[in-house]
Every structure is written in structure tokens, then in C-alpha cells.
């Protein structure tokens, strides 16, 4: 399998509790390299664009409000089979269902405040990365 990139967001529920370093440690221990990272305050327009796939869902407004409620850390991760690897490291969306040792089991507050986002496909990873990073922002 070739080296692949995926996109990650450390969400406001985690940044407000100063968990970025602890989450990064789990990411790196799993063999994922952080090749791009920045802490930002997402705007409403950015959050609405990022989560536009959910715009017709009843939770869309709450999701956008949550994502702009505090700083987030956007990241590009790299490894062989990075998308699958990171999704395994994140754990199930609902932390109650997440496996022991996963980011969501360790740090998430609830299904809504579940600490991290990760791309679900190579196509979405490319689109999500491009929303926040240029190739010049990333290291090898």
C-alpha cells in the first residue's frame, strides 16, 4: 500500500481541555506522521462549507455552532493506509461504542462532542485538506 494522506480536526471540546498534545501522542504512536498542523478559529462559513454534506440533517445547525464555539486544530496525517489507520485510531463516532485506547474512548465527552474528525475516503481527504492547506504548508 502506498503512503496516503488524511485530514483530521481536533474539535473544540478537546482543545478547550488542552488535549492536543495527548491526542497527537496517540496519533503518532499509531504510526501516523503529522505533516501539517495549525490551530484556527473556524468561521461559520468554513464550518458550513466543511459540513455541507450534512446541511439537510436536523443536527446541522448544532454541529456548525459547536465547530465555531472555540479553536480547532486542523491536521494532515500521513502513513500507509492513513485513512483506515486514522479511523481505527479515532474509534467509533459514539464514544460509548469506541474501543479501549482509541481517541474517542479516551477523550470524547459525547457523540456530539467526540473530540476529532477524520476523512472517510481518499476523495474527501483531498477535498478537506485543500480547504485548509496548500501543498507548500506540508512537510515530508
Curated annotation (Swiss-Prot):
GO terms for biological process: CTP biosynthetic process; GTP biosynthetic process; UTP biosynthetic process. Its cofactor is Mg(2+). It is an enzyme of class 2 (transferase). The active site is at residue 117. InterPro entries: NDK-like_dom, NDK-like_dom_sf, Nucleoside_diP_kinase. GO terms for cellular component: cytoplasm. Belongs to the NDK family. HAMAP family: NDP_kinase. This is Nucleoside diphosphate kinase. It comes from Hyphomonas neptunium (strain ATCC 15444). The lineage of its organism: Bacteria, Pseudomonadati, Pseudomonadota, Alphaproteobacteria, Hyphomonadales. The gene is ndk.
Amino acid at each position: 500500500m502506498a503512503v496516503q494522506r488524511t485530514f483530521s480536526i481536533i474539535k473544540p471540546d478537546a482543545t478547550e481541555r488542552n488535549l492536543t498534545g495527548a491526542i497527537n501522542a496517540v496519533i503518532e504512536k499509531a504510526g501516523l506522521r503529522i505533516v501539517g498542523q495549525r490551530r484556527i478559529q473556524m468561521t461559520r462559513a468554513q464550518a458550513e462549507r466543511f459540513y455541507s454534506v450534512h446541511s439537510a440533517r436536523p443536527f446541522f445547525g448544532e454541529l456548525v455552532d459547536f465547530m465555531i464555539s472555540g479553536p480547532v486544530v486542523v491536521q494532515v496525517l500521513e502513513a500507509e493506509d492513513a485513512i483506515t489507520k486514522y479511523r481505527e485510531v479515532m474509534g467509533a463516532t459514539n464514544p460509548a461504542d469506541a474501543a479501549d485506547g482509541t481517541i474517542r474512548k479516551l477523550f470524547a465527552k459525547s457523540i456530539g462532542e467526540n473530540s476529532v474528525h477524520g476523512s472517510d475516503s481518499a476523495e474527501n481527504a483531498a477535498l478537506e485538506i485543500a480547504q485548509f492547506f496548500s501543498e507548500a504548508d506540508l512537510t515530508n
